[in-house]
């Protein structure tokens, strides 16, 4: 919004050229989202408390968590407000990637809000049924996947629909240009061609998978928000490189016109996340709930797809991956042993993985900070793929 205003008034005030610089707008988006979160946080927490939207705690979990019962949840609304305002103020609203990321983020946010609402109203920690949640995630994820298959392939906004129709007329057999290939980290100028169907399948898996992985990780005070901020900031760097014809050529990455604008979104997400951490750090005054976790995970997955860094997201988001795998392994092994031996057996003391460490004697704050440190190391490793190729 401010970019369009600056471009319109640029002839009358030369200092407005500052608003056309991507890095300046990214810094301002971070500050804007951070200030909004810090200022509005107490008010949002009071409102959530008045609405009696307290978190229900599993009785079979660590006993130290029982004191958290009643802590306001659905605080992810605060994050989404900061992201929305900062992105709309400082982003280029003609950029197609901004809008598709916003659609996925807030679409998944709505799913999470409904899930949280049911948990609060019906006092049921399970919320929406897994089938219902997965269905709506799939609707949004598939729409985004189909759209991105052609918008990543085409530099011109107008021709995205034309490209889609050309694919339909080809009998759904048309390929995609090289910039839509799956990039392999650490390998210079080597990528794997996906085709339209492969791109759609991978994109769907990344977006929906990232959303649920972040949601599973959100179980301790401050645990998930800092990894989201770190991974989001790292993806913002990739977006800046991919969106620049100069830097992408120098670093031997495909140039994706318009991708650089995602730095604004990632910066806004970082600022909003840090503001939320102010109130979510131990002992938490508010939890983000599914409204925040599902939305942020979907956002990370969508940005990773646009900048063609799906594998790097898998690396940098290693904590999310480990948490998800711990649940999958626990459930699978329990069902197998129950069928085989008549009683279910567990690999971990409790899943997701952070609860296993808690029950192993780690304090909550130890688990949280150590997971942060691991994520920081993984993000630095992921960023090294910019040059180590």
From Swiss-Prot:
Chief place of localization: membrane
Membrane topology: Multi-pass membrane protein
Pfam families linked to this entry: Glycos_transf_4, MraY_sig1
Biological pathway: Cell wall biogenesis; peptidoglycan biosynthesis
Keywords carried by this UniProt record: Cell cycle, Cell division, Cell inner membrane, Cell membrane, Cell shape, Cell wall biogenesis/degradation, Magnesium, Membrane, Metal-binding, Peptidoglycan synthesis, Transferase, Transmembrane, Transmembrane helix
GO cellular component terms given for this protein: plasma membrane
Transmembrane stretches, start-end: 25-45, 73-93, 97-117, 135-155, 190-210, 222-242, 258-278, 286-306, 311-331, 366-386
Catalytic activity: UDP-N-acetyl-alpha-D-muramoyl-L-alanyl-gamma-D-glutamyl-meso-2,6-diaminopimeloyl-D-alanyl-D-alanine + di-trans,octa-cis-undecaprenyl phosphate = di-trans,octa-cis-undecaprenyl diphospho-N-acetyl-alpha-D-muramoyl-L-alanyl-D-glutamyl-meso-2,6-diaminopimeloyl-D-alanyl-D-alanine + UMP
Amino-acid biosynthesis in keyword set: no
Compartments in which it is found: Cell inner membrane
GO biological process, one term: cell division
EC annotation from Swiss-Prot or TrEMBL: 2.7.8.13
Cofactor: Mg(2+)
Highest taxon above the source species: Bacteria
GO molecular function, one term: metal ion binding
Function: Catalyzes the initial step of the lipid cycle reactions in the biosynthesis of the cell wall peptidoglycan: transfers peptidoglycan precursor phospho-MurNAc-pentapeptide from UDP-MurNAc-pentapeptide onto the lipid carrier undecaprenyl phosphate, yielding undecaprenyl-pyrophosphoryl-MurNAc-pentapeptide, known as lipid I.
Cited NCBIfam families: mraY
Family: Belongs to the glycosyltransferase 4 family. MraY subfamily.
Name of protein: Phospho-N-acetylmuramoyl-pentapeptide-transferase
Organism: Burkholderia pseudomallei (strain 1106a)
